[in-house]
């Protein structure tokens, strides 16, 4: 934790020094010198923290107090800087003379106290012979590792082939008396990976299917609702009598369900009242995974058990080899010395045959030189046996991370287990916390540097890739439950963050909380009712169902809060009153509201001059305040619904931006802003805008976007929703960087070859009129990988997706989805050369004849 706090202090001191230099110039040279001194000293202390931690781990108990002193010092300095920066900005706003202001004198006095503490710490570390390692690995530029995992197989089952074949045969055996298969074993053996691969292979042979993560604190009602949604139970039946309606449907269906990670039998006692027995008469199946054999035995009986075992040595080394070299090659070790191979085998041996430990260790070694010396150091750090399963291996991989990446990894522990986390959220929260900063001379954006960190974590196999974007970048990710536990344990030990269950206790400890996450309504409300002192709180995560969370927040100022995330999971829409005290969160940089809620952000939000991200989920009807544009640090304003609901969020004329009050250099995302509140000529000022979504697009906006020289040179994603048919022809061919385009119109709108950017990767057309000429244009796009056409009218009776005379027919297309086309009598594609790289074909809502080649028929199943 000490090194994390020190890094945060260094980054914040860089920011403050920059602000002083820009805003106050030479008048405050003495104050800037103090800030620069802080930065230098914190870097110096950080350089020997790792050495001190190694001595502590080696049994030198005297160092423990030194590390505690360093952590307290770093925390106090961070508090001082967080308190100081808003005062600089406020003073500059009202043209006060900062040099004569009282808070500047107070700051100077606090710096003197810190100097005395730094002298004491440096004296003690010399006494204990703690070496300055000058380790600046956090400042190194992480390589973009995207190429290492873009095409990786996400369902590796190396060493589990026999298990897979045996279970597949069992699940498809029509004579199976009781259709439950229980995959059990210790954490990290690959139970979930194996179960998912089985489930995905056989689910098409059943009438309905569902995959549910159960977890340590399950709720039967939520699990049943999840199953009901996946099998297509109507919304009315889910609301009226979920249990009875679900059971009635499943009685007449042949189903397969995967219930992942069941911890105890109580939850099964609740579920089995609704799930009909899986007997041989109907042929339904249930796959469960559990780390407890007794759970599997209770649910499916002795015959259901399939216990996974650690991998044998050769299979372990095969998995290690695949992960080290990133491809299957029997000659991978041909150029390696016999000693290096032997060290590699010894490293694998210390992993105890546990796939997760092997994969994580390989990820760590990939980031190092492939030399005997480098690998030997890892081997020596692993001890002589596997301790606590693979816990030591995982902790070693954490310590091997660059210092700047460690808090980014720990952030995954703030989310519930098995939560799918958007890369956009992680990246912008890391930036808000100043874990990621752009050094002078670096022309890349902070978001790009943060993405490098995320790529590195995935490359090291610490994080699991869940989804990719249209262009192959990370869209969302997950963390294995063992690594999630590691995050929580490390965070608690170092006071980086606390979960709700360990937040209660000594008031002094509660007052020092910097980050806290709640997964439970009851615990959260009880905690807030205890009236805790939370003056140092930086991050608050609330995963809840009770909308009263907002009223409880009204009793706290949270003056140092950087990040606020509220995720509401209730099924009904709830009106919430967001307290005006939100305006007191002067340090707030990141605000995310998600869930079925409606309300209004208070006007006091405009006082939050450091706000960088406002992210409102598609189910939330949260009205933005007037003046939100004026935050000069605003980078992302996201409203994720493009329907009428989103339009109603902007029903205040005062939202209309003053074009001269904008600070456009930072703005990167404007998503689903109604055109009526959007002045087209401000587009010229948004020079760094990467993503833009506009509702009710007007002729003037179309005209501005369609000029010969692109008005938004950095634009990568464009989403336009038209409420009427524009008279202007949209022309986007001059935008070379737009890779994702979404066009939605309610009436006829003409398109031609000039309508599209030349380098499209993903295109979505909704409610458009399409003819064979436009289709012929789309077939020629050299980079188009995903094409979706929803409720589009086709001007002719037959849509032919076959190759053109020139041979072109979607050369790079991987996904094609056509839904509810109007006016068609036939869709055909019978040749074998069209769409050669297609992986997924979805033809839904069709009421016409479909003629496909045998290859395409298989892809459409």
UniProtKB/Swiss-Prot annotation:
UniProt-listed SUPFAM superfamilies:
L domain-like, P-loop containing nucleoside triphosphate hydrolases
| Entry binding sites for ATP | 185-192
LRR repeat ranges are 225-248, 305-327, 388-411, 449-472, 510-536, 585-608, 609-631, 652-680, 689-710, 712-735, 736-758, 784-810, 811-835
Function, as annotated, reads: Inhibitor of viral mouvements which confers resistance to some tobamoviruses including tomato mosaic virus (ToMV) (e.g. isolates L, W3 and SL-1) and tobacco mosaic virus (TMV), but not to resistance-breaking isolates (e.g. B7, LT1, LII, Ltbl, ToMV2, and ToMV1-2) ToMV and tomato brown rugose fruit virus (ToBRFV). Elicits a hypersensitive reaction in response to avirulent (Avr) movement proteins from resistance inducing tobamoviruses (e.g. ToMV and TMV) strains, thus leading to programmed cell death.
Family in the record: Belongs to the disease resistance NB-LRR family.
**Complexes and interactors:** (Microbial infection) Interacts with tobamoviruses mouvement protein at the plasma membrane; this interaction triggers defense responses leading to programmed cell death. Binds to HSP90 proteins; this interaction seems required for defense responses toward tobamoviruses.
Q: What is this protein called?
A: ToMV resistance protein Tm-2(GCR236)
> What lineage does the source organism belong to?
Eukaryota, Viridiplantae, Streptophyta, Embryophyta, Tracheophyta
């Amino acid at each position: 934790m000490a090194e994390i706090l020190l890094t945060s202090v260094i980054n914040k001191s860089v920011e403050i020094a920059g602000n002083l230099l820009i805003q106050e110039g030479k008048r405050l040279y003495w104050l800037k010198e103090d800030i620069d001194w802080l930065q230098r000293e914190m870097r110096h202390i950080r350089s020997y923290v790792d050495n001190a931690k190694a001595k502590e781990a080696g049994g030198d108990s005297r160092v423990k107090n030194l590390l505690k002193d360093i952590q307290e010092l770093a925390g106090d300095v961070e508090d001082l800087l967080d308190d100081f920066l808003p005062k600089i900005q406020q003073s500059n706003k009202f043209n006060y003379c900062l040099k004569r202001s009282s808070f500047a004198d107070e700051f100077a006095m606090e710096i003197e106290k810190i100097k005395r503490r730094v002298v004491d710490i440096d004296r003690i570390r010399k006494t204990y012979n703690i070496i300055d390692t000058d380790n600046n690995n956090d400042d190194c530029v992480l390589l973009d590792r995207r190429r290492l995992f873009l095409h990786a197989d996400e369902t590796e089952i190396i060493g589990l082939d026999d298990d897979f074949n045996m279970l597949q045969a069992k699940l498809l055996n029509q004579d199976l008396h009781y259709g439950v298969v229980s995959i059990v074993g210790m954490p990290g053996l690959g139970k979930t990976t194996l179960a998912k691969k089985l489930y995905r292979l056989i689910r098409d042979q059943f009438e309905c299917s569902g995959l549910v993560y159960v977890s340590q604190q399950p709720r039967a009602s939520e699990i049943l609702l999840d199953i009901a949604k996946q099998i297509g139970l109507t919304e009315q039946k889910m609301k009226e009598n979920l249990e009875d309606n679900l059971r009635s449907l499943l009685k007449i269906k042949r189903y397969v369900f995967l219930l992942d990670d069941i911890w105890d039998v109580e939850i099964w006692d609740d579920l089995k009242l609704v799930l009909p027995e899986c007997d041989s008469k109907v042929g339904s199946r249930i796959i469960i995974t559990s780390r407890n054999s007794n759970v599997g035995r209770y649910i499916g009986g002795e015959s259901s058990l399939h216990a996974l075992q650690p991998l044998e040595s050769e299979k372990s080394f095969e998995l290690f080899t695949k992960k080290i070299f990133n491809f299957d090659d029997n000659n991978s070790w041909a150029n390696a010395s016999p000693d290096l191979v032997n060290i590699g085998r010894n490293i694998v041996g210390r992993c105890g045959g546990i796939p997760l430990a092997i994969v994580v260790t390989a990820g760590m070694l990939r980031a190092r030189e492939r030399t005997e010396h480098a690998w030997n150091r890892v081997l020596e750090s692993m001890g002589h046996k596997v301790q606590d399963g693979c816990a030591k291996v995982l902790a070693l991989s954490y310590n091997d991370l660059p210092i700047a990446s460690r808090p980014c990894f720990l952030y995954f522990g703030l989310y519930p287990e098995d939560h799918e986390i958007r890369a956009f959220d992680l990246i912008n929260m890391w930036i808000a916390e100043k874990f990621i900063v752009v050094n002078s001379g670096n022309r890349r954006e902070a978001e790009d540097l943060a993405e490098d960190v995320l790529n590195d974590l995935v490359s090291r196999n610490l994080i699991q890739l869940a989804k990719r974007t249209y262009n192959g970048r990370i869209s969302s990710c997950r963390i294995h439950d063992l690594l999630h536990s590691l995050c929580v344990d490390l965070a608690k030990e170092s006071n980086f963050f606390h979960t709700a269950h360990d937040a209660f206790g000594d008031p002094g400890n509660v007052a020092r909380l910097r980050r806290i996450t709640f997964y439970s309504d009851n615990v959260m409300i009880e905690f807030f009712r205890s009236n805790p002192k939370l003056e140092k709180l930086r991050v608050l995560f609330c995963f809840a169902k009770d909308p009263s969370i907002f009223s409880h927040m009204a009793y706290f100022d949270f003056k140092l809060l950087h990040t606020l995330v509220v995720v509401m999971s209730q099924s009904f829409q709830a009106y919430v009153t967001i307290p005006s005290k939100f305006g007191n969160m002067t340090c707030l940089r990141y605000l995310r509201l998600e869930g079925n809620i409606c309300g209004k952000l208070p006007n006091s939000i405009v006082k939050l001059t450091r706000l960088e991200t406002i992210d409102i989920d598609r189910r939330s009807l949260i009205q933005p305040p007037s003046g939100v544009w004026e935050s000069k640090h605003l980078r992302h304003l996201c409203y994720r619904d493009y329907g009428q609901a989103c339009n109603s969020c902007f029903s205040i004329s005062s939202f209309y931006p003053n074009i001269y009050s904008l600070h456009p250099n930072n703005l990167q995302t404007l998503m689903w802003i109604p055109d009526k509140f959007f002045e087209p000529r401000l587009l010229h000022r948004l020079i760094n805008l990467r993503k833009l979504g506009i509702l009710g697009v007007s002729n003037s906006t179309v005209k501005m976007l369609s000029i010969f020289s692109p008005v938004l040179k950095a634009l990568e994603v464009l989403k336009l929703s038209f409420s009427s048919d524009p008279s202007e022809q949209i022309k986007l061919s001059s935008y070379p960087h737009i890779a994702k385009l979404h066009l939605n119109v309610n009436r006829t709108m003409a398109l031609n070859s000039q309508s599209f950017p030349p380098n499209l990767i993903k295109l979505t057309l909704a409610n458009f009129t399409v003819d064979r000429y436009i289709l012929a244009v789309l077939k020629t796009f050299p980079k188009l990988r995903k094409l979706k056409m929803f409720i589009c009218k086709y001007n002719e009776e037959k849509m032919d997706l076959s190759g053109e005379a020139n041979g072109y027919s979607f050369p790079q297309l991987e996904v094609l989805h056509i839904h509810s086309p109007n006016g068609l009598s036939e869709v055909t594609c019978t040749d074998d050369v069209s769409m050669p790289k297609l992986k997924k074909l979805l033809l839904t809502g069709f009421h016409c004849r479909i003629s496909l080649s045998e290859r395409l028929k298989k892809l459409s199943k």
